[in-house]
Each structure stands twice: as C-alpha cells, then as structure tokens.
C-alpha cells in the first residue's frame, strides 16, 4: 500500500449503535479489538447487511501497524480470528433478554491471494448498518496508537456518552464492566493498571480530553464522575503519527 492509501484507511470512521457500545460484554485482547474495529471501519452507509469484507494480511499490517516478524502476520491474523470465534459477545437487550453471539459469521482464508473474507453476525445488523440516530462514530486512527486494551473500551464508552453532557457519573462496578476490568477487586489495582493508563492514552491520542473525580459512599469509592470535553486535535494527530510510524 502507498502512504496515501494507508493514511486514508486509518482515517475511516468506526460507527456503532450506542446500545452496542454501552451494553456489550466481551473479553478480547488489544489486537482482537483493533481487528474488529478495523473491520467495522470498512462498513459504508451504502452497504447492505450481509456484505462480505475482504482484506489482505499486508493491508492489516500496514494500516494497523502490526509489527512484521518474519512473515508471521498471516498466522497472527489467523490466530486472532480463531480466538474471536471462541469468544462470545454478550449484549443486554432488555431487563430479561441477553443476546449471545459473535462478531463475525464466517472467516474464509485464501492462501493464494493472502486475503481473508468476513461477514458480520446478522444479530449485529441493527447496531452497524443504516445508522440514523443514537450512534457513535470515531476515527479508526484514534485507537490504533493505543497499547492498552482498556484504553480502547473506555474511549468507545466515553465517546458514546459525550453528548449527554459535560459530566458523566458511572458506578465503579459498571465502569469495570464497560472496560472489561472486573478482575481487579481492589480499587487501587483497577486505578493503577486499567483506569490511569487508559486515560493517559485517551488524552494523548484522541479527540477527547478527560478528567475524573472519585465519588464515595461512606469511606468506599463507589463511582467515578468523568469530565469530558473536545481536545486540541492537531497535537493529538502528531502524537498518533509518531506512535504509528515508530
């Protein structure tokens, strides 16, 4: 790919329904998340549900800055998609209904062309196609520079609630669930290993400037209040370029 083609691919928007962002539960690695978002960025407003999306290993390497290691990118992509096929995606539909599905219906690998063909689960159609209202979009490049899986998930969530107001209050348990960090029982561990690194990357690479305050019930921290404003994009763009071109 030319530098221009790489830049254009990175500048594509990821668009998802807010319900999917705010109510989904899954356990994916950083690179598995990037692969999913990379594929979502390929959806255009004119695509019909059931559309197949094809990408080459070389394209994924260059756009997402996957470190090339002796031609192993093909195996890395294969392994990621294999893992994705075993990790369910849960979406809370109503108080009494939960959808359990996967991101993709099928993955077809073509060794002759070194490409992969994917199509999204039909159950995700309402959250990915023909979006008119109550959806969130962001530039793919904003998450490609991130090195923490928690950064990606927190950024998605904060983008989806940004228009609700300058401040956003969320319980600690719900925040851990949104970030996939339920394994941190102690707040200190969660703050040091998940929340702080995520906010550092969000404030370095994205279009959001985020601060927070801890809220207590008695002596125990039980909620986080985020302050979310638009960031100075030119400086963030330079930070992303440095990270992606290392």
Locate the predicted segments by residue.
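Charged, alpha-helix-forming regions
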Residues: 1-246
């Amino acid at each position: 790919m030319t530098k221009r083609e790489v830049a254009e691919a990175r500048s594509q928007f990821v668009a998802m329904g807010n319900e999917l962002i705010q109510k989904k539960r899954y356990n994916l690695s950083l690179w598995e998340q990037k692969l999913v978002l990379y594929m979502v960025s390929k959806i255009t407003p004119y695509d019909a549900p059931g559309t197949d999306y094809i990408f080459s290993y070389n394209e994924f390497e260059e756009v997402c800055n996957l470190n090339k290691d002796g031609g192993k990118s093909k195996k890395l992509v294969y392994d990621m998609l294999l893992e994705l096929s075993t990790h369910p995606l849960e979406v809370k539909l109503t108080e009494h209904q939960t959808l359990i599905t996967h991101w993709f219906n099928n993955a077809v690998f073509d060794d002759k062309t070194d490409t992969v063909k994917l199509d999204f689960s039909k159950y995700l159609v309402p959250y990915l196609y023909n979006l008119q209202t109550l959806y969130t979009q962001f530039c793919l490049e904003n998450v490609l520079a991130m090195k923490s899986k928690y950064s990606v998930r927190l950024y998605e969530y904060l983008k989806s609630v940004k228009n609700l107001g300058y401040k956003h209050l969320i319980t600690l348990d719900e925040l851990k669930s949104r970030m996939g960090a339920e394994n941190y029982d102690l707040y200190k561990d969660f703050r040091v290993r998940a929340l702080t690194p995520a906010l550092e990357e969000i404030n370095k690479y994205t279009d959001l400037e985020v601060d927070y305050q801890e809220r207590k019930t008695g002596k125990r921290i039980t909620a986080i209040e985020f302050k979310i404003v638009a960031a100075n994009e030119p400086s963030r763009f330079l930070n992303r370029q440095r990270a992606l071109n290392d």
